[in-house]
Curated annotation (Swiss-Prot), chain A:
Keyword flag Phosphoprotein: yes
Residue spans of biased composition, Low complexity class: 84-96
Entry protein name: Transmembrane protein 237
Assembly mode: Part of the tectonic-like complex (also named B9 complex). Interacts with TMEM107.
Keywords: Cell projection, Cilium, Cilium biogenesis/degradation, Membrane, Phosphoprotein, Transmembrane, Transmembrane helix
Localization annotation: Membrane; Cell projection, Cilium
UniProt main location, coarse: membrane
Biased composition (Polar residues): 97-107
From Swiss-Prot, chain B:
Name of the protein in question: Transmembrane protein 138
Recorded superkingdom: Eukaryota
Record keywords: Cell projection, Cilium, Cilium biogenesis/degradation, Glycoprotein, Membrane, Transmembrane, Transmembrane helix, Vacuole
Natural source organism: Bos taurus (Bovine)
Gene: TMEM138
InterPro entries the record matches: TM_138 (IPR024133)
Annotated glycosylation sites: 6
Transmembrane segments: 7-27, 41-61, 80-100, 115-134
Function (record text): Required for ciliogenesis.
Family: Belongs to the TMEM138 family.
Top-level taxonomy: Eukaryota, Metazoa, Chordata, Craniata, Vertebrata
GO cellular component, one term: cilium
Length: 400, 162
């Protein structure tokens, strides 16, 4: 109660007035027509008065208020203009949103008066906005106080204390958004704040282990992509080589001339993809645990086989680096300082083509092995859910 | 206790350095228009490896296991990574020195010998293994068990002592 009597300052909210300074330019005309109609103007004035002069007149009956409205025109005009603005901006929304709530709070106090009073509730809620905003910050605590106030006050002090008990129980809270106050459900606000609390509580569950696990899974995705891409690239490469070389490798000089710009870039790309694929395949068998890896390999586990094939392909591919560079620097044998002496072509290219073919086959096979069960990942099982027996709670969390 | 945000940051830095390493290993042979380009790439690559070594050791120091004085346990668990990283670092530097030495005058000439080819293959293979082991270690160090006393830690300690 004491709090409510302190409210008077609220009646002249400094912030809204600043807002109004900007707004009037666009909207004043709309408001004036409204205020000019006798009923409406009287009501609005009345509202203003009760709201604004509440503190000093706290004990006076409402009828006096209406008399005063007529006596003090100037100040009221100013306030009048202010209030409509507020109405437009905030209360219009409020009307639509919470028609039932407003009557509840004010209805009891105001009913003795006539029609205009019905609007009163809206005004008052406006006036209470600053307070409500304040409460919005401390929703949990204030709500309890509000309920008790409402129950005790309304019937006993029906006429006189209109402003005091009324404003509190509003279901709406006015939140300032982009320089306007907008109605929001108190219940919703509480919910959102609760949600925030909940999320704060949940955060700790996102542990470093989860980060590691998500990174591991992300890398596995990259690995799955690189397996397929590598297989496709290798097959494409070998097809291009055989097409360029002609029937039974009869046109090797043509192959060299055409392929020399491609040789080194492809070698680089092959290494990149092979490295990614090999690491990814190692991940799947948890290569670091040698005993497990060897056991899996001996058991002809597809993942272990794929890892072995990838590693072999990597070694073979790397061993052709020198030849690739030689192809890259190809100049016809007639040119001075050529690396390609007459007749050496077939001797150099034959093994190179065979190795490329083998690499393509190995890579294709590995891809088949791995794509047979793309979801299987031994290192995830071993690294992240090991010792489940010792830590049943953690183990469950991780395995899920 | 290791903070999730800190760990994420460190992990992303490690992966950044690893991917740079992979990139240079893959495409340095292509980017040899001028010897200086390769030189800079190689220097940064070596520094990246060095940084990665420093980071992984800092992560070790940050574990409860290390702070409790169980260095041997840590070394036992991650000796593969430590040794391999050191070997890879040595191989990288030697290959870089050799290649730059051969190519400094003319970056576009054929410099390959059997020795260089062998070193090249070993260095690149070590790079793949290093990438795998380092990644695995970095991910494993996210395990909260390394940052608190636990039954698991005690049992591990007993195993190592035996």
């Amino acid at each position: 109660m004491g709090k409510k009597q302190v409210r008077p300052p609220r009646a002249l909210p400094p912030v809204p007035s600043a807002i109004q300074d900007d707004i009037p330019l666009s909207r004043p005309k709309k408001k004036k027509p409204r205020t000019k109609t006798p009923l409406a103007s009287a009501s609005s004035e009345g509202l203003v008065q009760t709201a604004v002069h509440r503190p000093p007149e706290g004990s006076e009956p409402p009828t006096k208020d209406s008399i005063e409205h007529q006596e003090a025109p100037v100040q009221r005009r100013q306030k009048k203009t202010r209030l409509p603005l507020e109405l437009e901006t905030t209360l219009t929304q409020k009307k639509t949103a919470s028609p039932s709530l407003l009557p509840n709070e004010n209805g009891i106090n105001v009913e003795p008066d006539e029609e205009p009073v019905i609007q009163k509730p809206r005004r008052k809620t406006k006036k209470t906005q600053p307070a409500e905003l304040h409460y919005a910050n401390e929703l949990g605590v204030e709500d309890e106080d509000i309920i008790t106030d409402e129950q005790s006050s309304p019937e006993q002090q029906s006429v006189f204390t209109a402003p005091t008990g009324i404003s509190q129980p509003v279901g709406k809270v006015f939140v300032e958004k982009s320089r306007r106050f907008q109605a929001a459900d108190r219940a919703e606000l509480i919910k959102t704040t609760e949600k925030i609390d909940v999320s704060m509580d949940m955060k700790p569950s996102w542990t470093t282990r989860d980060v590691a696990l998500s990174v591991h899974r992300a890398f596995r995705m990259i690995g799955v992509f690189s397996h397929g891409f590598l297989a496709g690239c290798a097959v494409w490469n070998i097809v291009v080589i055989y097409v360029l070389a002609g029937d039974e490798l009869s046109d090797l000089s043509n192959l060299l001339q055409q392929y020399k710009t491609l040789a080194y870039p492809f070698q680089s790309l092959l290494y990149l993809l092979l490295a990614l694929s090999t690491v990814s395949a190692f991940d799947r068998i948890d290569f670091a645990k040698t005993s497990v890896a060897i056991r899996n390999f001996l058991a002809l586990d597809p993942r272990a086989l794929a890892s072995f094939l990838y590693f072999t392909a990597l070694v073979l591919s790397l061993s052709q680096q020198m030849t690739s560079d030689r192809i890259h620097l190809y100049t016809p044998s007639s040119v001075n300082g050529s690396l390609w002496a007459e007749g050496i072509e077939e001797q150099v290219l034959q093994p190179w083509i065979v190795v490329n073919l083998v690499v393509a086959v190995l890579v294709g096979l590995s891809w088949l092995f791995l794509s047979y069960r793309p979801g299987m990942d031994l290192s995830e099982e071993l690294m992240f859910s090991s010792d489940v027996e010792e830590y049943p709670d953690k183990g469950i969390k991780v395995s899920s | 206790m290791l903070q999730t945000s800190n760990y994420s940051l460190v992990l992303s830095l490690q992966f950044l350095l690893l991917s740079y390493d992979l990139f240079v290993n893959s495409f340095s042979e292509l980017l040899r228009m001028a010897p200086v380009i390769q030189l800079v790439l190689f220097i940064i690559q070596d520094i990246a490896i060095l940084f990665n070594i420093i980071i992984i050791f800092l992560m070790f120091f940050n574990t409860f296991v290390f702070q409790a004085g169980l260095v041997n346990l840590l070394f036992h668990k991650f000796k593969g990574t430590i040794i391999l990283t050191a070997v890879y670092f040595a191989l990288s530097i030697s290959l870089h020195v050799w290649v730059m030495n051969l190519r400094w005058k003319n970056s576009n000439c054929f410099v390959w010998t059997d020795g260089l080819q062998t070193l090249f293959v070993f260095q690149r293979l070590a790079a793949v293994l290093y990438c795998y082991f380092y990644k695995r270690t970095a991910v494993r160090l996210g395990d909260p068990r390394f940052y608190q006393d636990s039954l698991w830690l005690r049992m591990e300690f007993m195993q190592v002592r035996r």
